[in-house]
Amino acid sequence: MDDVGTKTAAGEPKERDPKRWLILIVLCLSTLVLVIDNMVLTVAVPPIAEDLNASASDLQWILDSYMLVFAGLLLTTGSLSDRFGRRKVMLIGLLLFGAASLIATIADSPEQLIGARILMGVGGALIMPSTLSIVITVFDDEERPKAIAAWSSVTMVGLVGGPLFGGVLLDHFWWGSIFLINVPIAAVAFLAAIVLMKESKGPWRKADPVGMVLSMVGMVSLVWTITEWPKEGFGDPKVYVAAILSVLCLVGFGIWETRVEEPMVPLALFRNRVFTGASFSIVLLTFANGGLMLVLSQYLQFVLEYTPTKTGWAFAPLALASLVFNALSAVLGPKIGNRFMAALGLAVIASGFFTLATLEPGDGFGIVTTAMVLMGAGGGLAMPAAQAAMMGAVPHEHAGVGSAMNDTVQQAGAALGVAVLGSILSSTYGNKMPDDAPGKSDESIVEAFSEAARTGNEALVHTARDAFTEAMSSAFVVGAIGVLVAAALSLVLMRTRGGDTPPTAAVPGAAQPDGSESAEASADVKTGR
């Protein structure tokens, strides 16, 4: 059935789907399998390298191939879900993701595993936009904040629980088990979706093949540039060419979408200040959080000497606080408004980053726990509010591509956070190490520990820990500033003319109280003007 918003043509509220909360469980399960899979892989690199005799380049492609394909296809798959049906696209994605996971378990060469990861990226790109867009169309305005908060909390559980879950699997089974576990989860979600969900899609629109190609090439080039820049340097010819290609394609995409009769992405959405403000807030929030686990996990393992499993458990306070405050956000958001909820949450996250910036090599886990609780609480308040504001500004017929844009800005923000905060960490660490540091110990704390183990130089270990902690503080201050900028943008841009009321009715192409659409507004969204 086509989308008609949350009201009938007569202006009466749509009847609530009695299976909607079961549907939400299926959507959360589908999202969880994607997040956990990526996080689990980070702890499986050593056994994969040993068993498949994979080089450093092979391992990099095993890790990056999924993300490149996933990020590159999001806008296209979101548009396809609006066009052909969100349930149908999600089912195809689950089928492909499960099959690719099965292929990954039997891979006996790096090339086969990379191929399986590429297929998993395609499957993930089909699944992810469909999940949030179905949440938007199944739940009405009153229940939607609660549903989005529940869906959002699953991401945090996967991010924190993935490495821990992977460590448990690898302690008892071979590395292929981290992929095999995806198969039954995908199968359950597939069957449950068939039984519980009705199809939903927007009005039929012509395909936009030029927009699809430009968005795919542009996003793949952008993400590749962001991930390779810290390792190769911006002066590297490959990075330089990829950066130019991404700019040309994405600028070309923007120009094309404003001229084509039926654009893949309605760029008129960015004329809505709530949508734009929420988008920027999400980018900067994920920018800060993207580098958090990269930087803090190294501190826990190399400075506090935690094992990988203990490091995973150390992030539990963040996940628990996020779950609690996700629920609180769902209750308070409709009362005080998404704008203030997002700004409050972002300010709390910034306080967590500033707390982490005070860490010293001799500090225990107490300060880390305090910071984790603050950041989990802030994320639990801010992310659902920003996502609800962003998706509330998207007409229902564009729910799929709106969800894809939410996923895309998160991917770009997280990748940029890893690149920028990682670069700050690396360069500051090198500057803090003495000029006569032996070997390559001034390049990373890993190299310093290797050099110390080889030469028995215990003083080098202490020097490296001091330098790393100072570098980490600099990275976290930058993260805090990014989040504070996001908070300011939330307050300034996410303001609606009628106060902090849900913005959907004022959005071009959104359903009006009588169930109709403004002809001019609808045309603006259709043509991207």
Walk through the language-model features, giving the residues of each.
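Transmembrane-helix bundle of Major Facilitator Superfamily
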Residues: 2-195, 325-330, 335-340, 347-350, ...
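A membrane-interface helix-boundary motif in multi-pass transporters
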Residues: 171-181, 228-239, 307, 427-480
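Membrane-interface helix caps and helix-loop-helix hairpins in membrane proteins
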Residues: 110, 200-205, 229-235, 362
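C-terminal membrane-cytosol helix-exit motif in multi-pass small-molecule transporters
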Residues: 144, 184-200, 218-227, 246-259, ...
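C-terminal module of multi-pass small-molecule transporters
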Residues: 85-94, 103, 110-111, 130-131, ...
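Short, Lys/Arg-enriched, Gly/Pro-containing loop segments at transmembrane-helix junctions
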Residues: 202-206, 262-268, 434-436, 498-508
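Transmembrane-helix exit segments and adjacent C-terminal regions of multi-pass membrane proteins
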Residues: 2-31, 274, 388, 450-529
